[in-house]
């Protein structure tokens, strides 16, 4: 339990019908007494005036008191539900901050206290922020699944399996004369493979959850007048970019946030790439390259009426040479309605080639399907959970150590090395739920939350 009491507005700033102020800590009951003038009945809504120190009424509304440990934070919690005007909220917060021992909450501090008081684990705490930030119905459902503990349960199942296997392996190590027989009887190998398979399934679901949370950054790049802005408009379903026959119309970066079957995409249109003499256009081209360097995928736009080539190295070798190897590329042969080429995905080599008409929209559905496939997005997120980059990293490290352990078991019957790899694997999994997390990591996570959460 912490010794200080915190206060913050729990509802979004600005005007609204209702505004909620949340107080958590050992002085929550004292705050209730001083602001409402009475001792509140636990877990009971009372309509009361909210008073200044001199007894004048600042507002009136509903007061709710939740004594520890049966509250969101696990501490004594007070909620004041008043009128949602910013002036009223500010007056009430100033009134509460005037009470000795009460301070303003840091961003995410209520959720942090809930985590520290074992009211939720770290993935559930993160899911609160993800639920608030959800940009689609599918993302909200996934965040809610994580908040309800689905991701945590999957991790806990893995950890329990690891613990049982570690006990067996370490017992074998304690009896050196029988260690080889223990390790070679097939149980260890079978249990280890089952854990690896289970972890692979969790990683696949977590990758879907990360896509749902973070989206995919797709940059449309190419020479001027290749149809980049027309493709942005076709994908977004609206006239986001100005389209003309004049080369260099787009001089800055244009962004649109869209969804394809629930998968969030950040589509970025960039200035046409060429040797420009105009200073403004030069700046736009440099910004284009900056965006390309940060992309998950680049759509390399080609005007199909100017070349028959399909290999980007034949079309523009300098572009291919400058593109980072880690970034996937799809070649888009635009204006297929004018060249008479067959629309859609023409082959699935690297890079994939798609023929379409950004102007008419023909072939654009094939591109949408292709983008989902590039991210490994199935679209079947019912029951899925939300995941973050740190979760994927921890799962990846866990998988690597399991692989090392399996190699040591199968190749050398090295029980001690296997036991150590299992221990490290468990440590990485515990980082996800917060059972083993540094204070620095916790600080970074909760500081990104809203104040009042």
From Swiss-Prot:
Residues annotated as binding Mg(2+): 229, 250
EC number of this enzyme: 3.6.-.-
GO molecular function, one term: GTP binding
Subcellular locations according to the entry: Cytoplasm
Residue positions binding K(+): 225, 244, 246, 249
GO biological-process terms attached to the record: tRNA methylation; tRNA wobble uridine modification
Enzyme class, broadest EC rank: hydrolase
The keyword GTP-binding is assigned to this record: yes
Cofactor or coenzyme needed: K(+)
Binding site for (6S)-5-formyl-5,6,7,8-tetrahydrofolate: 22, 79, 119, 453
Domain of life per record: Bacteria
GO cellular component: cytosol
Cofactor binding, per record: Binds 1 potassium ion per subunit.
InterPro entries (alphabetical): G_TrmE (IPR031168), GTP-bd (IPR006073), GTP-bd_TrmE_N (IPR018948), GTPase_MnmE (IPR004520), MnmE_dom2 (IPR027368), MnmE_helical (IPR025867), P-loop_NTPase (IPR027417), Small_GTP-bd (IPR005225)
Binding site for GTP: 225-230, 244-250, 269-272, 334-337
Keywords, in A-Z order: Cytoplasm, GTP-binding, Hydrolase, Magnesium, Metal-binding, Nucleotide-binding, Potassium, tRNA processing
Pfam family, one: MMR_HSR1
Domain TrmE-type G positions: 215-376
Family: Belongs to the TRAFAC class TrmE-Era-EngA-EngB-Septin-like GTPase superfamily. TrmE GTPase family.
Subunit details: Homodimer. Heterotetramer of two MnmE and two MnmG subunits.
Protein's job: Exhibits a very high intrinsic GTPase hydrolysis rate. Involved in the addition of a carboxymethylaminomethyl (cmnm) group at the wobble position (U34) of certain tRNAs, forming tRNA-cmnm(5)s(2)U34.
Name of this protein: tRNA modification GTPase MnmE
Organism in which the protein naturally occurs: Vibrio campbellii (strain ATCC BAA-1116)
High-level lineage: Bacteria, Pseudomonadati, Pseudomonadota, Gammaproteobacteria, Vibrionales
């Amino acid at each position: 339990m912490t010794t200080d009491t915190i206060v913050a507005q729990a509802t979004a700033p600005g005007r609204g019908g209702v505004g909620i102020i949340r107080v958590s800590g050992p002085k929550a009951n004292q705050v209730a007494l001083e602001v409402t003038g009475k001792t509140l009945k636990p877990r009971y809504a009372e309509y009361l005036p909210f008073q200044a120190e001199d007894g004048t009424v600042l507002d009136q509304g509903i007061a709710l008191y939740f004594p520890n440990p049966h509250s969101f934070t696990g501490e004594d919690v007070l909620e004041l539900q008043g009128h949602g005007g910013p002036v009223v909220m500010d007056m009430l917060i100033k009134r509460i901050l005037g009470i000795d021992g009460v301070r303003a909450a840091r961003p995410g501090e209520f959720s942090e206290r809930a985590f520290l008081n074992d009211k939720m684990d770290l993935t559930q705490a993160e899911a609160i922020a993800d639920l608030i930030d959800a940009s689609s119905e599918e993302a909200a459902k996934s965040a809610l699944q994580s908040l309800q503990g689905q991701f945590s349960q999957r991790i806990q199942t893995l950890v329990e399996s690891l613990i049982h296997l570690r006990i067996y392996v370490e017992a074998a190590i304690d009896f050196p004369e029988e260690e080889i027989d223990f390790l070679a009887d097939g149980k260890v190998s079978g249990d280890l493979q089952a854990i690896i398979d289970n972890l692979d399934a969790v990683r696949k679901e977590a990758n879907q959850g990360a896509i749902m949370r973070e989206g995919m950054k797709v940059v449309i790049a190419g020479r001027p007048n290749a149809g980049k802005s027309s493709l942005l408009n076709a994908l977004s379903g609206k006239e986001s970019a100005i389209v003309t026959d004049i080369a260099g119309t787009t001089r800055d970066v244009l962004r649109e946030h869209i969804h394809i079957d629930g998968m969030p995409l950040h589509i970025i249109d960039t200035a046409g790439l060429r040797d420009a003499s105009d200073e403004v256009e030069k700046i736009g081209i440099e910004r284009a390259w900056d965006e390309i360097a940060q992309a998950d995928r680049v759509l390399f736009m080609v005007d199909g009426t100017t070349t028959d080539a399909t290999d980007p190295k034949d079309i523009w070798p300098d572009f291919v040479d400058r593109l980072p190897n880690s970034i996937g590329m799809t070649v888009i042969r635009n204006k297929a309605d004018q060249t008479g080429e067959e629309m859609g995905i023409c082959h699935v080599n690297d890079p994939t080639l798609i023929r379409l008409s950004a102007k008419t929209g023909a072939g654009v559905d094939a591109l949408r399907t292709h983008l989902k496939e590039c991210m490994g997005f199935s679209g079947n997120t019912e029951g899925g959970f939300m995941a973050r980059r740190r979760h994927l990293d921890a799962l990846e490290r866990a998988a690597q150590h399991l692989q090392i352990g399996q190699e040591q078991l199968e190749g050398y019957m090295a029980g001690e090395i296997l036991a150590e790899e299992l221990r490290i694997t468990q440590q990485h999994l515990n980082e996800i739920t917060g059972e083993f997390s540094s204070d620095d990591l916790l600080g970074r996570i909760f500081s990104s939350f809203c104040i009042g959460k």
